């Protein structure tokens, strides 16, 4: 059990038998009336996001989530295979569980997999990854009034928007949360 004072981003709550992860929270102390906590909760299994308000001091049941470092090995038909870095056990995860993260998965990449009672819940990619551009059209200078972008396909097959000076073969740093270009990687 956790009090609303213990709320933090990433905490997983068990509400009515379903697991919800706190993505945002705010303690509110109005001029009149009791304090409360406004939260945004994401359903761990379905990905659905809801707003929920808790009275300050209320106790809420938490779920035990074990985050383990794993290495992405390969895709096997309809599943993604990850190996636990501690006990070398292999876990076959469904495309639904992996979600949009598959757009940035490279073989040998270390990712965190969250488990609850032995069952995988979701994966957490690093905030940024380095990927090579496999295809992009050449950017033309001077054909616009402001700085422009163009689509580029990276080695995982994902398409991201990049500045016009990026060429095929360049290595980029990409934000995995929103698929945005962060910069070029030298070397």
UniProtKB/Swiss-Prot annotation:
Primary location class: cytoplasm
Keyword set, alphabetical order: Cytoplasm, Elongation factor, Protein biosynthesis
Gene that encodes it: efp
One GO term of the biological process aspect: peptide biosynthetic process
Organism domain of life: Bacteria
Entry function: Involved in peptide bond synthesis. Stimulates efficient translation and peptide-bond synthesis on native or reconstituted 70S ribosomes in vitro. Probably functions indirectly by altering the affinity of the ribosome for aminoacyl-tRNA, thus increasing their reactivity as acceptors for peptidyl transferase.
Protein name: Elongation factor P
GO MF terms held by the record: translation elongation factor activity
Pathway(s) per entry: Protein biosynthesis; polypeptide chain elongation
Family recorded in the similarity comment: Belongs to the elongation factor P family.
